[in-house]
């Protein structure tokens, strides 16, 4: 019952990179070289043209931003709420882009160090996240993809808060986020503005940076998020509460957290 649909969904769900590219935009460094063949085909298949993209700035809401230390669920109830929010926030168009089964194909399990490494290399071999612009929507698509296809509970994908390189806070995940310079021509040219995702992605980031995923195998044996920014791990960092607050304040993160609480 429903076998044909399930098989079709599984086949479509196999190309995560295509799903992410369909969500919006293109990889950096290719604006002047032309769109990738796979992306062009995906646009044609979906029946959507570049005119659907907009230069209007997307309003940033810190309460929705994923890459902050206060976004990491601390309790089982918070985890359930986080997962439900991920599901509620992704609309019908996202479901079509992801193309995965409605229910997890395997039993749910927590992300582990070994599993994170395995998934990082698996995604890289399948085309990877390399160079794909990061935004909140693609963050949720990746969460949902790994939850439905691999049964991984979506409470693991957190990155350091920036500015600058955002390191994964889950040890073993080998994809970091790096700031990408957008050329002045792309910033100012109205035509390019319509097709270049960097024109809107910078509004998703509190520091105004455009971010892209980058594979870093060194993250398998160097916990850079903890080494560089232990304060973002709170009480787990081993730092005193006063030192944690001092470091977060110096980086402007406590101010962001306070603004979130009052908004």
UniProtKB/Swiss-Prot annotation:
Q: Where is the lipid attached (N-myristoyl glycine)?
A: 2
| Name of the gene this protein is made from | nef
Identify the main location. Answer: host cell
Q: Where are the transmembrane segments?
A: none
Task: Kindly give the Pfam families that the UniProt entry links to this protein.
Answer: F-protein
Query: Which topology term describes how it sits in the membrane?
Result: Lipid-anchor
Q: Which UniProt keywords are given for this protein, alphabetically ordered? A: Host cell membrane, Host membrane, Host-virus interaction, Lipoprotein, Membrane, Myristate, Viral immunoevasion, Virulence
> What is the protein named?
Protein Nef
Q: How does it assemble?
A: Homodimer. Interacts with host CD247/TCRZ; this interaction induces down-regulation of cell surface TCR/CD3 complexes.
GO terms of molecular function: GTP binding
InterPro entries in the cross-refs: HIV-1_Nef_core_sf, HIV_Nef
Which parts of this chain are annotated as the region Acidic? 88-96
One Gene Ontology cellular component term attached to this UniProt record is:
host cell plasma membrane
Quote the Gene3D superfamilies the UniProt record gives: Nef Regulatory Factor
Q: Which family does it belong to?
A: Belongs to the lentivirus primate group Nef protein family.
Extract the SUPFAM superfamilies matched here: Regulatory factor Nef (SSF55671)
Any idea what job this protein has? Seems to play a role in optimizing the host cell environment for viral replication without causing cell death by apoptosis. Enhances virus infectivity and pathogenicity. Probably involved in viral immune evasion mechanisms.
What is the organism of origin for this protein? Simian immunodeficiency virus (isolate F236/smH4)
Q: Where is the protein found, in the record's own terms?
A: Host cell membrane
């Amino acid at each position: 019952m429903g076998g044909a649909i399930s098989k079709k969904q599984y086949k479509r769900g196999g190309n995560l990179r295509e799903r992410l590219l369909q969500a919006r935009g293109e990889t950096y460094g290719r604006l002047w070289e032309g769109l990738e063949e796979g992306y062009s085909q995906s646009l044609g298949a979906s029946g959507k043209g570049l005119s659907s993209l907009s230069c209007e700035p997307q309003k940033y809401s810190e309460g929705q931003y994923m890459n902050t230390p206060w976004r990491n669920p601390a309790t089982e109830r918070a985890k359930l709420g986080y997962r439900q929010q991920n599901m509620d926030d992704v609309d019908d168009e996202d479901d079509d882009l992801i193309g995965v089964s409605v229910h997890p194909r395997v039993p749910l399990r927590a992300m582990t160090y070994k599993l994170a490494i395995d998934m990082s290399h698996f995604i890289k071999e399948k085309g990877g996240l390399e160079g794909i612009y990061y935004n909140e929507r693609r963050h949720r698509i990746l969460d949902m993809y790994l939850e439905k296809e691999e049964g991984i509970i979506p409470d693991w994908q957190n990155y350091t808060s920036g500015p600058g390189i955002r390191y994964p806070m889950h040890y073993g995940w080998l994809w970091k986020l790096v700031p990408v310079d957008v050329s002045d021509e792309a910033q100012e040219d109205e035509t390019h503005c319509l097709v270049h995702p960097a024109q809107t992605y910078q509004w998703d980031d509190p520091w105004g940076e455009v971010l892209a995923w980058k594979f870093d195998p060194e993250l398998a044996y160097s916990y850079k998020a903890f080494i560089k920014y232990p304060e973002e791990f709170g009480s787990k960092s081993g730092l005193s509460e006063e030192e944690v607050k001092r470091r977060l304040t110096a980086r402007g993160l406590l101010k962001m957290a306070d603004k979130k609480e009052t908004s």
